[in-house]
Structures are given as C-alpha cells and as structure tokens.
Amino acid sequence: MATLRHFPRGFACSSGKKLAIFEHSEANGVTKKEIELQDPVDNKPKDEDAIEKKAPSKNEEHVLATSVSPSGRYLAVCDIVKQLHLYDAEAEWTRLSTRELPRRCTSVTFTQDELHVLVADKTGDVYQYKVIDEDGDSKSEEENKGAQLMLGHLSMLLDVVLTKDDQYIVTCDRDEKIRVSHYPNAYNIHTFCLGHKGYVSSLVYIKENNLLISGGGEGEIMVWTLNGEKCTETMCANESQKSSQDHGDFGVKTLAYDQQNSVLAAICYRCSRVYVYKLEYSESGVSLTKSVTITTDEEPWDICFDNEYQLWVLQPRADNCVRVYQWSDDDNMLKMLDSEKSSRASCVQRTINSSWDFFKESVGVSAHLPEGLRKVKVDNMKDYLEKKQERVSGIKRKPEQSEPTESTEKFQKQS
C-alpha cells in the first residue's frame, strides 16, 4: 500500500522500498526526487534459516508508517524490518539517522516542538526518540539504539496523536479503547474514550475546538471531547452500500480533516468510496453531516488535505493515480479540482500521475494492518447446551468395559 503525506512545498510518497518527494517551487516548477530506504546493517552472525523466516514476503508492504513534522521540515519513515528513518527537508532530504526499533511500527508522529518523534508498535508500546541531540547533530547509531518507553497498552496500537501544546498523548488500540494520557508523564491517564464496538484504526485531533475524531472497525466515526465525552457519531455507509461490496469488512482505514472548512474525509477497507462530512457547531452541540460520497476507480490507498485545503486521493490506477478535490462554498461540497483556479496543484497532480512506475510496486500489496484485527466470536453456549441436554436425558457416555481375560476368570473362580 502506498502512502501520501503533505508538507508545505509538496508531497512525500512511499511505495515499496522507496520514497518519492514531489516538490514545487516558482523557479523550478515541480521536481521529483526518489530515495531508497537503507537496508538494516547487523554484523552479528545469524542463522540463515532464521533470516529467511523473518524476511518479509512479497505481498507485504515495506513502509508501515510515515509522518511529517508540524513545520514540514522532518519526515519520519518506519519500515517492516523494524527501522526508523529520519530525513531533513531543509538539507535536500538528507537522511539524519536510521534507528533500530524493538517491534514493528503501526503509527508514528512528531511532538509540536519537533524535538522528539513517537513510535507506536504492535505490542502496544509507545517509544520516544530524539530527532536531534543537544549539539545539533543527529545521534550516532549506538546512541540511537536506546529509546524512552512512554506508555503501554495490553493490545496492539493502531494510531497515536498529540494534542495542543503536547498536553496529551492519545492512543487507540485493537480492543476498542482510546486512551488520553498526560504528556510526557504518560503513566498518568487522563481519561478513556469508550464507545467503539471494533478496533479503533484512525485518530484526528481538531486543534481549534480541542476535539478528537476516531474511526473504528465497525465503520463508525465518533467525535469526542478530551474528557471522554462522546459528542456525536455516524456510520460511514448504509446497509445497501455495504451489501454492494464484495467483502464484509467495512472498517475505517484513514481519516483526514480540513481545519479551514471543518470538512472530514474517510476511506474504508475494501471500499471504492470517499465519505465526506461537514462538522457543524451549534448551541446544542456538535454534529457530523454527510456532504458527499465520492466514488473512486479503486479502493484508495491514502488521503490527505494540503495547505490550500484541497483533498488528495491516492489510488492504484495507472492513468489516474491521484485525484484532487476542492471545497465549493456555493455547493457546500467537495468538487473535482478546477485546473484554472489552482495551476500549482494541477502541476503537482500531473507529475504524480506520470510516476506510475514508482507506485505500481504497491499494487496488490495488502495493508500492514492484519486481517486478524476483527475479534473472532466463539459460540461456547451451543456446546454447553448439548452437554447439558445429554446429562438431563441420561445419555452421558460411559467408557466401554473390556472383555474378561483368562487370568481374570481364573482369579474370580479362586476368590
């Protein structure tokens, strides 16, 4: 699965073992730079059979999570071989460091001051790493091996975000929980946001109103206060739309939010649609109103809003890899980009669409979230009732008695 992340001058994309930076400037127009991720370096002797078992399969994605820092200067990339790569945009995307992670990452984010990067993993832990050391240089490989454990869940973490001024760290997991913890003292839990009936896959923080939006495996989107109060909720798709899909899994994959127009976009697993909502505020509270449902050619890989509040949809389509939509106040909905009104976005879009050789590496690659996120329901009651009925009816099975042997008969006669 390919990813799409926006920074002030363009977009950072990942596909396979490579990154592609699409950068726009008035002098040079749109430029493209490809970066290949560094392979792990380990001088310790290892058993060849063990290496073969740990090697990722061809249908697994190599990049598991990416994040751009608030200013757009730094890019963090976590891969399937348990490495954290940091790049500096101001130094022409120079790699600052590559650090070894204890477990495979599921989500990564930066603090607001950009001094630290937080990595959530499959075992439910969040580790903190320094971006730059006190001397202004990236830390050496030996120093980078150490990491500060911030918090831990008893279930796989799926997303992590930080709130305004890094006051709280919010994490969500496979077991329907959203946890709001104080930062940096994350052992001090502020509250839980409980209400989802499936795994919680994506979080969005609204800075202006201090609200949290979550998307779950049951297909529901919920809006919360940071005190754990649920403001509103909505279902992504109705039953008719669900039945039209080939598969039953309709969990929310990714959420993206436009702060300027209060517009929320959501994509789901195994669904070729983008659901767009308008977040409205009134005296009675907060509400999510569906604005439009955008039909795509394929199931989207990723979505994001740029700094011009335009929605970018990345999909596995050779002739139309990325679609761009802009908000229309007249129609109160997202509409296809008008190239005359945004020549800059159109130039970037054309460059991305002409880079199918880069994106095709992700075609057919499954998302890093495993199919086992949904809990398997075990019907123990059926077996219990059957055994109970056997006891009531007196049909309880008894072990068969073996036929008496000659020695047994002789012993019985003597006695």
Please annotate each region the language model reported:
Residues 8-9, 71-73, 113-115, 165-167, ...:
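Short coil/turn segments that connect the beta-strands within blades of beta-propeller domains
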